[in-house]
Amino acid sequence: MTEYKLVVVGAGGVGKSALTIQLIQNHFVDEYDPTIEDSYRKQVVIDGETCLLDILDTAGQEEYSAMRDQYMRTGEGFLLVFAVNSAKSFEDIGTYREQIKRVKDAEEVPMVLVGNKCDLASWNVNNEQAREVAKQYGIPYIETSAKTRMGVDDAFYTLVREIRKDKDNKGRRGRKMNKPNRRFKCKML
C-alpha cells in the first residue's frame, strides 16, 4: 500500500484543522483552537488504489514558523489553504509556495490551492482571482467548506493525484537520463 505524506499549510484561522478533521473523522469542529502541529492517518481508495494518507496539519501562526522547514522537507504534497473571507490569507499563499519550493529545492512541487469557508455569504476573494493564481502556479484549485464537507475529499484526493503525476514524470525523466547514448559505436581497428 502506497503512503502519501500530505501537508496542510496556510495562515492561522483558515480552517486547516477543520478540513483535516472533516476528512478523517467526518465531523466539523467549529471552535478555533490554534494548532501547533497534528498528524493524522487514514486509509482510502483513490482511483482504485488503496493508499494511506499521512496528513500533517500545521500551525498557521507566525510564532511557529521556525518549524515549517522541517515539515516542508518531509512532505510530498501540499494543500495551500486560504479562507475566502480573508484577503490576507490569500495573499500569504505566495509566501508559503515560495518557501516550499526553496526548502524542497525544486521548481515543481505537488500542490493544490484550496479556497475554504465557501459556505460563508461574504467572500473577500472571488473564485476568478483564485483560479488565476492557480493557473499561474500550474496547480489545481478546489473550493471547499469544512462545515458542509463540500470539496473536502476532492482537495485531498486531487493532491494525491498530483503527487502520482509528479512521481510518474520524475520516473520518466530518470529513465531517459539513464539510457545509454547508442548513436556512437566504438570499433577497434
From Swiss-Prot:
For the lipid attachment S-geranylgeranyl cysteine, which residues are annotated? 186
Tell me which EC number(s) this protein carries. 3.6.5.2
Tissue expression remark: Expressed in the posterior termini of the embryo, restricted mainly to the embryonic central nervous system, and in the eye imaginal disk.
Q: Please give the annotated consequence of changing residue 38 to E.
A: Mild rough eye phenotype
Q: Which residues form a coiled coil?
A: none
Pfam families the record matches: Ras (PF00071)
Enumerate the subcellular locations listed in this protein's record, separating them with semicolons: Cell membrane
Q: From the UniProt record, list the residues forming the propeptide.
A: 187-189
Give, from the UniProt record, the effect of changing residue 40 to C.
Impaired cell growth, survival of postmitotic ommatidial cells and differentiation into R8 photoreceptors. Normal eye morphology
- Per the record, residues carrying Cysteine methyl ester are 186
Question: Which leading EC class covers this enzyme?
Answer: hydrolase
Topology versus the membrane: Lipid-anchor
The record's section on InterPro entries has:
P-loop_NTPase, Small_GTP-bd, Small_GTPase, Small_GTPase_Ras-type
One GO cellular component this record assigns the protein to is: membrane
Q: Which UniProt keywords apply?
A: Cell membrane, GTP-binding, Hydrolase, Lipoprotein, Membrane, Methylation, Nucleotide-binding, Prenylation
For biological process, the GO terms are:
border follicle cell migration; cell fate determination; cellular response to starvation; chorion-containing eggshell pattern formation; compound eye development; defense response to virus; determination of adult lifespan; dorsal closure
Q: Which GO terms describe its molecular function?
A: G protein activity; GDP binding; GTP binding; GTPase activity; protein kinase regulator activity; protein serine/threonine kinase activator activity
Annotated binding of GTP, by residue: 10-17, 57-61, 116-119
- Give the regulation of activity: Alternates between an inactive form bound to GDP and an active form bound to GTP. Activated by a guanine nucleotide-exchange factor (GEF) and inactivated by a GTPase-activating protein (GAP).
Q: Position of motif Effector region? A: 32-40
Q: Of which family is this protein a member?
A: Belongs to the small GTPase superfamily. Ras family.
Reported function:
Ras proteins bind GDP/GTP and possess intrinsic GTPase activity. Plays a role in eye development by regulating cell growth, survival of postmitotic ommatidial cells and differentiation of photoreceptor cells. During larval development, mediates Ptth/tor signaling leading to the production of ecdysone, a hormone required for the initiation of metamorphosis.
Protein name, UniProt field? Ras-like protein 1
Whose protein is this, by species? Drosophila melanogaster
What gene, per UniProt, encodes this protein?
Answer: Ras85D
